[in-house]
Amino acid sequence: LEEKTMSTVRVQPLVTTQWAADHLNDPNIRFVEVDVDTTQYATGHIPGAVAFNWQTQLQDQVARDIISQEDLEKLLSENGISNDTQIVLYGDNNNWFAAYALWLLQYYGHDNVSLIDGGRKKWLAENRETTTDTPSYPATSYKVSKINHDLRSDRDTIKKRLNDPNFALVDVRSPAEYVGDIIAPPGMSETAQRAGHIPGAKNIPWGQAVAEDGTFKSVDELKALYGGKGVTADKEEVVAYCRIGERSSHTWFVLKYLLGYNNVRNYDGSWTEWGNLVGSPIKKGPEA
């Protein structure tokens, strides 16, 4: 799981629960829990882990956008995270929002970031140590040094490439959302004026990439899953989208890190943007 270089040890983007347990006391690592249900952390979490709230801390609170550079610097500084800290993320719901946080951190240039395979579910299933103590760490002065714009897509880029054979779109929502029977999963508040999908998108629900225990499926299974729909490594660009950008971060992680696709982007505007756009092309019904 580690690549030893001359002076540092580079941690792989995906680590096991055992690796995490072995590194609980490593001062260069900060464990961060990011849950869909933000009350989960208080019921028990990995010792030493801090929590990020996806609703209030990872999104702009006024504009429809990701957290600003300044707010991210403040969040990381307050949690004692420096530019060279290895951030190890995990969460509930098979790492939905942990993957979103990883995408966001990489977008803002923090490369030393990993995901615990299986997330919170696997950690608890293995009866590993938890605590209800909330740790505090000495503040740092975190500074973003670069922004990786090539990890993010937007509506205008997608519109221009809709008929491009070298471009692949993956809609990772449920089949019911894809065909246009429903606009959002039951109980979710963010919806859209229109239901359906972006023309040409292939429907590969995010959950098809994970096994029963919440870990990712094998590389061979994943290759068959995406390759079977024509979402292959030889595409010039692959873009994943969902409803608000969190489920698609999960698929983005699979394509980029587990399958090694060169150019994968997350369209975080996703259906809550596209389904509300005046004049945007939409399709309903099953894949052509």
Task: Pin down the residues of each PLM region.
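Helix-loop module immediately N-terminal to the HCX5R catalytic loop
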Residues: 56-87, 202-237
